[in-house]
A protein has these predicted regions:
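Catalytic cores of secreted or luminal carbohydrate-active enzymes
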Residues: 103-113, 621-670, 674
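Acidic/polar, glycine-enriched structural segments that form the non-catalytic walls/loops
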Residues: 29-58, 63, 67-335, 353-358, ...
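Carbohydrate-binding/catalytic loop surfaces
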Residues: 323-334, 380-402, 458-477, 523-535, ...
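C-terminal beta-sandwich/jelly-roll accessory domains of carbohydrate-active enzymes
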Residues: 676-761
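Acidic/histidine-rich catalytic neighborhood
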Residues: 442-492
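Active-site core of glycosidic bond-cleaving carbohydrate-active enzymes
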Residues: 337-373, 392-397, 404-426, 434, ...
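Carbohydrate-binding surface patches
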Residues: 151-160, 665-692
Length: 761
């Protein structure tokens, strides 16, 4: 009797399970997803418009192509317009590996001297075409400029048309002093005591004219040179075009030949063909993904960050450092690895601009030998590392030794997490096997040299430096990265079927590594070191974000996250812009959309310039870029192998839509939300990875070209047997969804650019 009862119950269970699955089977009629977006018109609402001419770097119009940069503003106190040029390749090559030995170097600017006195002016940055129009009204007439940095060619092109008596305005090249920007700042501030006594100045630039091409050649004491070349052509009586190239060579001294050849090639092609190819690149760039937000200001901000990223880097061009191609006098004329690089690159993954993220991959994967030289000699046989500040070839001062002084050793592992995110959004196992796995392994190896087993049977780290806080044993910053690194190496080895000799070591580390030091207020800085004074970095919270080792999927962790975040933010004295974006993303990680928005609003209220640039003691660009990722974190998350659609939406954000956002596992996701309710979701698998989604749709139906098997999991989570190349369309049962992505109409637009009434600096 008992046996028959068990058989009956088993059959009943199977029947109920099959019934559940059959309810979740798709309708075999494929849906379609469409975009109802007029891209030129939509992007025109995001444009930056200046109602008056800016006079500072923070307010200027900016253009770039991942190598060359241009900023346009009126010179303060002078009667000319300044076109500040930049080239990310231009840096010094001295033997000292610091900001005096290997910094980026300024190039100089063009001064547009009008015939009359400048009365006023306006500017308009056309994001869709990446072009700036400038109108200058003087006592003698009007000068109209159309400027762009060509998307593919290494050319800056400025076309001028004039009215009245301004046709004979003058261009003047003013070469910059080619010494470390930190030297320039200390010199201007009268802080000669902070300048190394043995610092030698580079020679001044020499200007010449060679067959219509003007040249400014800057030789460097340590070798190499920079040439800035320009030539002006005239078309009708009122039209003049300035063609500019900047070329840096090292150790060769052939920059002038390259510079002249680039200018002559561009002039032969002609202005309109050059403009056409430039616009084609940008018009192709933006539609890779789409986001529209219920707040016009934040929508404007988001798209300016996409423009900024594409202006600052390309896959085969410069790594984004602290200022991108818009270098100015700054204390930070290099790449900073203790937070800046990591924050800068996050937004490229979800926005599906992984082609741009390749500049970070190339910087690290192509300089393994240099990463080895950054490590003390005794550990170079199996370890890699990077110091706080590097040039674009990853050359830094030597990484410290744990237990000795201020050893900051976790920066390369943190950068490897960025590489891991790029991999997870692409799922290219060749990159994982041949590049990321070996790099991550040797970056984690450096930790392994110093782990010691304590009397408690746990593995402990000697004192290391928690970025910008203090040196402490069992530093949470490093414990988190070590734990994440070992987990990731084991996961990768399993995926790739690699029988690595260190597998048991990594397992042992995970088994015996000491827990994160905590107290009643959450995570500490490290062993016996509480968070005692205000700290702009969230290095001690890395296990929460972006590593998600402590996360809401583990119920006991939620309280730890809330306490740690609250206590960090309770000491506001030193909190700055990226303290806001970090707190926003941590809030999103636990589903608190209202808090996420509140933290983000603090950034907008205090730290942004009129052009979304960011200022601390000098210009830096990473924080606004990280805010784009904070917006992503509200709309879409994919950590832990699960796609979460609209995971942290503020109550006031009733309408949202996005299309083509990319997640870990290489899925493309589109979704629409109206009146606070999700209307539909569309997911396409690019790699065939397991597809698990969480949605607020209570009774979803799943449609596609075949019947998918859907497994229902707790918390409105579903696993879909989606194969590579397949698409699934998800909508509420009983409701008709149109699967059309369209922009949200706004009553305001063009929030950024310098305004006459609401001027911000």
């Amino acid at each position: 009797m008992k046996k028959h009862t068990m058989n009956y119950l088993n059959k009943l269970y199977s029947y109920l399970l099959l019934s559940l699955i059959s309810i979740l089977f798709v309708n075999a009629h494929p849906a379609t997803i469409k975009q109802d977006i007029d891209w030129p018109q939509f992007m025109s609402q995001q444009d930056m418009i200046w109602e008056k001419l800016p006079e500072y770097w923070y307010d200027s119009a900016f253009l770039g192509n991942g190598k060359l940069g241009l900023m346009i503003y009126k010179e303060p106190g002078k009667n000319y317009l300044r076109l500040e040029t930049g080239n990310c390749d231009v840096h010094d090559h001295r033997t000292k590996r610091d900001v005096f030995g290997i910094p980026r170097l300024l190039t100089g600017h063009f001064a547009l001297h009008p015939k009359g006195k400048i009365i006023n002016g306006t500017m308009h940055l056309d994001l869709w075409n990446a072009e700036v129009s400038t109108d200058i009204t003087t006592t003698k007439g009007v000068i109209h400029l159309r400027s762009f940095v060509h998307a593919d060619e290494m050319m800056i092109i400025v076309k001028a048309t004039t009215e009245g008596d301004e046709h004979d305005f003058q261009w003047e090249w003013i070469a910059a002093e080619a010494n470390s920007p930190r030297y320039l700042i200390f010199k201007r501030q009268g802080k000669a005591n902070k300048i190394p006594k043995d610092y030698e100045l580079n020679p001044t630039a020499k200007i010449s004219n060679e067959k219509e091409v003007n040249l400014s050649v800057q030789k460097l004491l340590a070798g190499g040179e920079t040439s800035i070349g320009w030539q002006e052509t005239h078309n009708p009586e009122t039209e003049r075009t300035l063609w500019i190239n900047l070329t840096h060579t090292y150790p060769q001294n052939n920059s002038s030949e390259i510079c002249k050849a680039e200018i002559r090639k561009a002039i032969r092609k002609g202005y309109h063909p050059m403009q056409k190819t430039h616009r084609k690149w940008w018009n192709t760039f933006y539609p890779s993904s789409f986001i529209t937000l219920p707040e016009a200001q934040k929508e404007n901000f988001y798209w300016i960050q996409m423009y900024k990223l594409a202006s600052a880097t390309r896959g085969d061009r410069a790594l984004i450092d602290n200022t991108g191609p818009w270098l100015t006098e700054t204390p930070w004329p290099n790449v900073w690895w203790n937070l800046n690089v990591q924050l800068t690159y996050w937004a490229l993954n979800t926005s599906d601009h992984l082609d741009l993220a390749a500049s970070l991959e190339n910087a690290l994967y192509n300089h393994i030998d240099q990463l080895r030289l950054n490590i003390p000699k005794a550990y170079r046989h199996n370890s890699l590392g990077i110091g706080v500040a590097s040039n674009l070839e990853c050359m830094t001062t030597e990484v410290g030794i744990p237990g000795k002084g201020k050893a900051q050793v976790g920066l390369l592992p943190w950068a490897c997490h960025n590489l891991w995110l790029i991999y997870r959004h692409k799922m290219d196992d060749d990159i994982l096997r041949n590049k990321l796995f070996p790099l991550l392994k040797e970056s984690i190896n450096y930790y392994l040299h110093f782990l010691k087993e304590g009397d408690d049977g746990k593995l402990h780290l000697p004192a290391t430096y928690s970025p910008e806080y203090d040196t402490v044993e069992d530093c949470n910053f490093d414990l988190a990265l070590l734990r994440w690194g070992c987990q990731t190496l084991l996961e990768s080895a399993h995926r790739l079927n690699i029988q690595d000799s260190l597998i048991e070591t990594w397992k042992n580390v995970l088994l015996k590594l000491t827990p994160y030091p905590t107290d009643e207020n959450g995570l500490l800085i490290g062993k016996d070191m509480p968070y005692a004074f205000s700290h702009r970095h969230y290095s001690h919270l890395l296990a929460i974000y972006p590593l998600y080792l402590i996360n809401k999927e583990q119920p006991n962790d939620i309280e730890m996250i809330e306490k740690s975040l609250s206590f960090w933010q309770s000491k506001p004295t030193a909190l700055l812009g990226y303290s806001c974006t970090g707190a926003s993303s941590i809030s999103s990680a636990i589903g608190k959309g209202d808090d996420a928005l509140a933290y983000l609003n603090k950034l907008f209220g205090k730290f942004l310039s009129s052009t979304t640039m960011y200022k601390e003691s000098g210009p830096v660009i990473e924080t606004p870029l990280s805010a784009a990722q904070s917006i992503h974190d509200m709309l879409l998350q994919s950590w832990g192998g699960k796609i979460r659609i609209f995971p942290a939406i503020p109550a006031t954000w009733k309408d949202i839509a996005y299309s083509g956002l990319r997640t870990e596992g290489a899925f493309k996701v589109s979704a629409s939300r109206k009146q606070g309710k999700t209307q539909f979701i569309h997911i396409k698998s690019l790699a065939g990875e397991p597809c698990i989604i969480t949605t607020d749709i209570v009774n979803p139906i799943f449609e596609g070209k075949r019947n998918f098997t859907i497994q229902s999991l707790p918390n409105n989570t579903f696993q879909i047997d989606l194969k590579k190349g397949e698409e699934v369309f998800i909508s509420p049962q009983g409701e008709k969804s149109d699967f059309i992505i369209s922009s949200i109409p706004h009553t305001s637009k063009n929030h950024y650019g310098l305004k006459i009434i609401h001027q911000r600096r």
